[in-house]
């Protein structure tokens, strides 16, 4: 799917967008004198927003995605010809900062470096827009030699990651197996796209970044039912993953 389609999917699967649409529609109905329909729309919109603002929803949605790719020691990973790490965890370096900012999912870069330093792969391919300024300095700081780092610097979404990295791998005929590093909740969709675009290469998941499992293990009522902006943001990511995965499977 293109970038514009991705943004539309993100908007229409956002719990906040859905809730606001329902509430505004309900208020319009009430203004037109349709009290029953308007009241129901406002109630459903409010309930929808509350559900997806809770840690309970995140433990269910995120935990299910993450448990598909359980935590694994680097020592248990197979040897591969390259590590592919998807970007998004490191803020691009700017003139106003001394060091790049670590964002949600920054442990992707650390895990890729960990894999290389364990001798499981000789090369890291960092894929994503701005990765030359973001992940490259951090990989070097984590001890990966610059000559062992390849950067694909133009991808704006996961499908572009898969397509552009597949082109890089096609130029490396000896590359038969890669370890794919991304957040555990993102792995299912990323694997689907990489295995489709790089069909001649064995793509092995090397997941990291487990938050849903931790949330599920620390689940406690009634605290997990209290709404928060952080949970709303995380659940928005999870819903986008589910819709993106099934949309890609159906449409492609």
Language-model-detected regions and their locations in the chain:
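C-terminal capping/extension of enzyme domains
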Residues: 219-252
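A structural signal for short, hydrophobic/glycine-enriched beta-strand patches
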Residues: 51-232
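Membrane-interface helix-boundary motifs at transmembrane edges
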Residues: 30-38
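Hydrophobic alpha-helical segments of integral membrane proteins
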Residues: 1-9, 57, 61-65, 235, ...
């Amino acid at each position: 799917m293109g970038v514009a389609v991705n943004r539309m999917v993100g908007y229409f699967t956002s719990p906040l967008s859905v809730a606001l649409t329902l509430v505004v529609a309900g208020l319009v109905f009430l203004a037109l004198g349709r009290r029953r329909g308007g009241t129901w729309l406002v109630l459903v919109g409010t309930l929808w927003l509350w559900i997806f603002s809770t840690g309970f929803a995140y433990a269910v949605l995120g935990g299910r995605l993450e448990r598909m790719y359980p935590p694994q020691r680097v020592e248990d990973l197979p040897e591969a010809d390259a590590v592919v790490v998807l970007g998004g965890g490191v803020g691009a370096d700017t003139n106003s900062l001394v060091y790049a900012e670590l964002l949600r999912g920054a442990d992707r870069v650390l895990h890729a470096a960990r894999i290389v330093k364990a001798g499981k792969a000789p090369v890291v391919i960092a894929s994503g827009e701005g990765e030359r300024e973001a992940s490259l300095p951090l990989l070097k700081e984590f001890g990966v030699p610059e000559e062992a780092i390849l950067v694909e610097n133009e991808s704006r979404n996961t499908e572009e990651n898969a397509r552009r990295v597949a082109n890089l791998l096609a130029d490396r005929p000896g590359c038969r197996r890669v370890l794919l590093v991304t957040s555990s909740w993102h792995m299912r969709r990323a694997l689907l796209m990489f295995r489709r675009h790089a069909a001649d290469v064995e793509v092995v998941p090397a997941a990291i970044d487990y938050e849903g499992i931790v949330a599920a293990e620390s689940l406690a009522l009634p605290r997990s039912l209290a709404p928060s902006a952080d949970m709303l943001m995380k659940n928005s990511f999870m819903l986008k993953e589910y819709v993106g995965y099934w949309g890609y499977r159906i449409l492609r």
